[in-house]
Amino acid sequence: MFNMNINSPVRFVKETNRAKSPTRQSPYAAGYDLYSAYYYTIPPGERQLIKTDISMSMPKFCYGRIAPRSGLSLKGIDIGGGVIDEDYRGNIGVILINNGKCTFNVNTGDRIAQLIYQRIYYPELKEVQSLDSTDRGDQGFGSTGLR
């Protein structure tokens, strides 16, 4: 089922002349940096959809995960949403959330997030009356402790 040629290039389109090609900053970087095609201002506590003006065709059996950049995370900037489905072909947008205390400016050409390609499995779902029990059971949200 996972017959995927990892050497096949991923096709993308620059929708406008403002778009920058996604790039990796090192040979072993997990993600490709995505760039803002426009200038935006994000006040503290607010969020903004940032357009890249890039559209692309995801590899078969993969989806694109939009992940934060560590340098922006240090400034209180996070990502909302973050999934690009295999069959999506539109302008890739990134929701930036300003959790900081200062207004955050996004300049045209700024690196705003990273795109990571991940394999996906499309299971068939089956409703049942109960699930197999485990030692953990329904314990979640901190139930395993800090240490």
Curated annotation (Swiss-Prot):
CDD domains assigned to the protein according to its UniProt record, in alphabetical order: trimeric_dUTPase (cd07557)
Keywords: Early protein, Hydrolase, Magnesium, Metal-binding, Nucleotide metabolism
Pfam families hit by this protein: dUTPase (PF00692)
Description of what induces expression: Expressed in the early phase of the viral replicative cycle.
Alphabetical list of SUPFAM superfamilies matching this protein: dUTPase-like
Co-factor(s): Mg(2+)
Claim: Magnesium is one of the keywords in the record: yes
InterPro entries in alphabetical order: dUTPase, dUTPase-like, dUTPase-like_sf, dUTPase_trimeric
UniProt-listed Gene3D superfamilies: 2.70.40.10
EC number(s) on file: 3.6.1.23
Reaction(s) catalysed by this chain's protein: dUTP + H2O = dUMP + diphosphate + H(+)
GO MF: dUTP diphosphatase activity; magnesium ion binding
List of residues binding dUTP: 68-70, 82-85, 88, 93, 95, 111
GO biological process, one term: dUTP catabolic process
Residues reported in the UniProt entry to bind Mg(2+): 24
UniProt similarity note: Belongs to the dUTPase family.
Function (record text): This enzyme is involved in nucleotide metabolism: it produces dUMP, the immediate precursor of thymidine nucleotides and it decreases the intracellular concentration of dUTP so that uracil cannot be incorporated into DNA.
Full protein name: Deoxyuridine 5'-triphosphate nucleotidohydrolase
Native source species: Camelpox virus (strain CMS)
